[in-house]
Amino acid sequence: MLYLCIPSHNEAPTVGLLLWKIRKTFQAFPREYEILVADDGSTDATADILEPYAKSLPLTVLRHSERRGYARSVEALLRMAVDRTDRPKRDSAIIMHADFAHGPEYLPDIIRQL
């Protein structure tokens, strides 16, 4: 299993497109994966945008009612991935940014390196 961990705060303009591109990437490069998103106290429409994707993608959203910061969001996502794995020596986690700082088009190359 590959866990894509995405911390986000007020990423309404980009998070939907990112999830769509991740889906397209894994259609062309099939792997078992799960997307874990931390919505870190967003005050925009981030939560509303994430909701429909949870119905069509292997997506879990962790919502913080108030902002805790990037490091705590990453820690929470990695802990969630560790708690979910039943193959810790085989599974991996990749941290991505919701603003396309790390584009999904690089995922196949990253996964091949694992």
Predicted features along the sequence, with ranges:
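Structured catalytic core of nucleotide-sugar glycosyltransferases
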Residues: 1-114
